[in-house]
Amino acid sequence: MKKTIALLLSAALLLTAARPASAQSTEPSKENFPSTETTLSQIGQAEAHPNAKHSRMADTSALAAPVKRPGLVRRIIDYYSRSNVDRTFEKKIDWSIAPGPNYSSDVGFGIGFLLAGLYRLDRTDSVTAPSNISIYGNFTTKKFVLLRFSRDNIYNKNKQRLSYSGAFVYFPGAFYGVGYQAGKEGYAQDLTTTMGIFRISYCTSLVGRFYVGVSGGIDYTGAKYKNSGMVEYMQKIDDNEIAKPGGQIGEMYDLWKDGKRYDPEKQDPFSNFIAATGDKPNAFNTNIGLFAQYDTRDVTFNASKGVFVKFEAKWYPEWLGNTRRTFGRFTLTLDYYLKLWKGAVLAYDLYADATAGTPSWHMYAKMGGMERMRGYYEGRYRDKRLIETQFELRQKIYRRHGIVGWIGGGQVWGTDRFRWGNTLCSFGCGYRFEFKNKMNIRLDYGWGNFGNRNLPWDRKRSSAFLFTASEAF
């Protein structure tokens, strides 16, 4: 199972051909538009066709004739052809909206939407970059639900920034266990999680592009699960109490008897983890933190040049409401962007995540998702320590359209020892469409390592479609 959302762009988005506006000024934070953000569409009031021209006529009755309103298709094309123009000096909030039908084997068919707005707190200030707000949602046939909002307020010629975001997630997913070996073995237990998340941060410039700030967050995760009963079922087959079935179950029985290539005792990794650690399925975590960052990027959500470095330390004390424990978390992000030839950018990303103490089961560092190690189910590989790196080549090919290709690698360790042989790879390609000024909608397809080929459900190479707004990093 791979937790990703594949979204197919609507044909209306692909019909546009307006030139992108110039880049915005540097903003002082790594926080992109939410990594899961894209689209449902709302067309504003109809306007006369932009190519329509009024000429003076001798017949005065012609002057009184009503102007023909453009059709729906023409209005959609006109709307998106103007959507990447910076209108933040004209409007209080420059809203855009777009649809996102999607499909994934993990979550089924779905409808997603993105409502995104750019605005300036002072419309007479051309130095400070625009602030932004976004609301994203996705609903699928397999009952996956995601609702998320974020807002970034930029002040005082980019010297201060206040950011906050929240999300609600209902996800019928899977748990593979903790540690590299657990992820490699591929035993997954169905696990339905309900998550509520809130984040807030504030940073200010000390010297030039060097910023320091404070942060806070609240996480709640509730889990529902049940045992597969596979140990008892296999034993009944072995004791001839029931006949051996055909299909996948029969194959699993043969694998169990043939050299223990299948172990039914590992079929319920979440139940085993809870029993072994005494952890609680439902966990509440709050944190306070400090961070420092250096940022020379030209645009935060679609950089073409510059450097971004951020170190953050978070503390989760038990007295602040954390479930039965106190632990710390440390993250490091390093991004570098270099213009190559016309329309080409080489982007590099390095990310490290480590915990001190023992976190709740859902707070371990997780590999995979929509930004790093694309192609892996997020959380299949999780542990106390994680490191990931990737190179991505981005090439604009025609006006607002572009393509990318990337290659990367990563590791998790802590429960298991660090070994170079445990390194996982990620590679893929994608399409880009400039939806708003310097903001891309991206459609990626990523691949990873093969799963456990002994298991009938895990023999293919890990892969995933991804669709969201803004670049991965």
Model-predicted regions and their roles:
Residues 101, 113-115, 133-139, 149, ...:
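Transmembrane beta-barrel strands of outer-membrane/channel proteins
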Residues 118-122, 136-142, 169-173, 221-223, ...:
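Sequence/structural signature of outer-membrane beta-barrel proteins
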Residues 278, 288-293, 297-398, 406-409, ...:
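C-terminal outer-membrane beta-barrel translocator/porin domains of Gram-negative envelope proteins
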